[in-house]
Amino acid sequence: MEFDIFFSISQTPDHNGFTPSESEMFSNYYAQLDAADRLGFGVAWIAQAHLSTKTQQMNSKPVVPHWKGEVGLCTDFCQLAMESFRRTKNIDVGSAVVSILASGGPIAQAERIANTVQFLSHMDSNRKLHVGFSAGRFEFMARPYGIIPR
């Protein structure tokens, strides 16, 4: 049986009100990723969200039950994926999910993914990049990018 791991890398206050620095946030992620790699997890799924902290905190039914905060890091998935591959030996990396609208559109995303796959092919590895896309779940995530859902 194969087990995967889901990472919601978020810079939001914990239950004690502590907000980690970006350096601490990434250090925690890399430590957890290293442990998952050593323990034999199959895929490290990385969540991504944009501009959702305040809105998510007001949501009476949050995406992640009992968690009123950011669902995933606002970052370039491909860059984080390559760094994750560089730091590990066995685990695959996947996006959960990349918002097409909030990340430059479908053509820009296709180019990023193609480049990332090409970079990965030059590593001594048979590992895979798993990619999931979405059109964006919430209007507040798309509107700042000039996209007004119908």
Predicted regions: what they are:
Residues 94-98:
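Long, well-ordered hydrophobic secondary-structure segments characteristic of membrane-embedded
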Residues 37-38, 82-90, 116-129:
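Acidic (Asp/Glu)-rich catalytic clusters
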Residues 1-87:
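N-terminal beta1-alpha1-beta2 module of alpha/beta enzyme domains
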Residues 2-20, 99-150:
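Flexible, glycine-rich active-site loops centered on histidine and acidic residues
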